[in-house]
Amino acid sequence: YDQCLMLAPGYLPAQKALVRLYEKQGKWLDLVGMYEQDLTDTTDREEQIQTLNKMAQIHEDRLTDFPHAIECLKRVLEIASDHLPTVRNLGRLYERAGRWTDLLGLHDQEAALSGDTRQVVSLAHRNAEILEEQLKDRAGAVAAYERVLALSPAYPPALKALGRLYAQDGKWEELTRMYRAEAEIAPTT
């Protein structure tokens, strides 16, 4: 099959047979190499995106090689920076790999592409949590929670988190303001 593909690159029957053979034998790096060759043989944007996503999936699922999976997805974004499924997959990988700073920027990129206000608020809130819990950046977390509330003033998780941080830091005026905001959105019984 290799010889057939050397003589006729892109010959689909040989390519499919070789994919099956590599998968059956668990020759994942050979399969990735074949896909890499496919990338040099095409200029079609959608084919490149599809091939790079296949490569990323093999690196992640079969080889447990997050750095190479991440690189494949970053290559997709070089071709199509607005490809939302890839942005989300890359975010998932950044989280699995503990690349928190990279994830913050990617969430901002996803929010810009999303266009859905609830999603934007959710991503901003997740960034605030990452700053607080993973990066231990209290000041950054406070600023991020405040940005969430600027987007959605009645967002209960951000109100609670910001209130908690204000209490821990002894910022009583800010805490009073948070309690008032929470009371305004609380249902009356």
Q: Where are the language model's segments positioned?
A:
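Repeat-based scaffolding regions
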Residues: 1-189
